[in-house]
């Protein structure tokens, strides 16, 4: 590879297309309630009809930001956790590894949210060491084109740093999740079910939905994830 080509590759690996950076609490999954900085990356490989961040679907929706500049912006918030979300963050895999390296150099914990279509990190990637919350969309919501890459199950077993989170609306959905994780050999301790929230629910309806899904989690011996940020009206 020529010197100019190497410079070009290096530049690509240190620039991310970023939709937004903001502070909130992590409202979902194993780190619920943690003060966090969210980094929303542009681009997604799915078109989920229930998606509440459609503005991040296109790669062009993001502003190009250098990794060093982005790390400095994140550090100013002094977060307990950095949540990298999307879109689908792994579409920007190479610069994402550079971002993780920069964040870890500051001693920051990193959690990545993914739909699990793309392969799990390899051992030689910076991403191998971060926490992952995988939200498969092939069960029970069945989004076209969604299929969990089998490497995520192996990654979870090898590292203990991955959890699987499923959107559910009723008991049939929960039954499908239970059958799915049993077939793949995913321990229930690594599985969360979370309410699939339609648009325009008032607070009473939102609380009732959370109560129903939480009761189903107990019945089926699964972990329950609220959507805490919705309940407390944070971004």
Swiss-Prot record:
InterPro entries: 7-CO-7-deazaguanine_synth-like, Aldolase_TIM, rSAM. The keyword Iron-sulfur applies. Substrate binds at residues 25-27, 40, 85, 235. Pathway: Purine metabolism; 7-cyano-7-deazaguanine biosynthesis. PROSITE patterns: RADICAL_SAM. S-adenosyl-L-methionine binds at residues 87, 135-137. It comes from the Archaea. [4Fe-4S] cluster binds at residues 44, 48, 51. GO terms for molecular function: 4 iron, 4 sulfur cluster binding; carbon-nitrogen lyase activity; magnesium ion binding; S-adenosyl-L-methionine binding. Keywords: 4Fe-4S, Iron, Iron-sulfur, Lyase, Magnesium, Metal-binding, S-adenosyl-L-methionine. Mg(2+) binds at residue 53. It holds the Pfam family Fer4_12. Residues 31-235 form the Radical SAM core domain. Binds 1 [4Fe-4S] cluster. The cluster is coordinated with 3 cysteines and an exchangeable S-adenosyl-L-methionine. Its EC number is 4.3.99.3. Homodimer. This is 7-carboxy-7-deazaguanine synthase. It comes from Hyperthermus butylicus (strain DSM 5456 / JCM 9403 / PLM1-5).
């Amino acid at each position: 590879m020529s010197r100019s080509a190497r410079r070009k590759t290096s530049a690509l690996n240190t620039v991310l297309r970023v939709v937004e950076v903001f502070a909130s609490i992590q409202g979902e999954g194993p780190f619920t309630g943690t003060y966090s900085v969210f980094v929303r990356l542009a681009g997604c490989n799915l078109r989920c009809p229930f998606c509440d961040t459609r503005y991040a679907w296109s790669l062009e929706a993001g502003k190009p930001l250098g990794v060093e500049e982005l790390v400095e912006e994140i550090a100013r918030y002094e977060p307990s956790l950095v949540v990298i979300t999307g879109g689908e963050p792994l579409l920007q895999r190479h610069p994402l590894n550079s971002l993780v390296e920069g964040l870890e150099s500051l001693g920051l914990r990193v959690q990545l949210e993914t739909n699990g279509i793309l392969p799990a990190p390899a051992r030689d990637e910076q991403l191998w060491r971060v926490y992952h919350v995988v939200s498969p969309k092939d069960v029970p919501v069945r989004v076209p084109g969604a299929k969990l890459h089998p490497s995520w199950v192996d990654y979870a077993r090898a590292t203990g740093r991955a959890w699987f989170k499923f959107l559910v609306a009723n008991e049939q959905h929960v039954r499908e999740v239970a059958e799915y994780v049993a077939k793949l050999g995913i321990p229930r301790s690594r599985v969360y079910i979370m309410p699939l929230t339609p648009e325009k629910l008032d607070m009473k309806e939102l609380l009732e939905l959370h109560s129903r899904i939480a009761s189903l989690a107990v019945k089926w011996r699964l972990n329950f994830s609220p959507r805490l940020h919705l309940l407390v009206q944070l971004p």
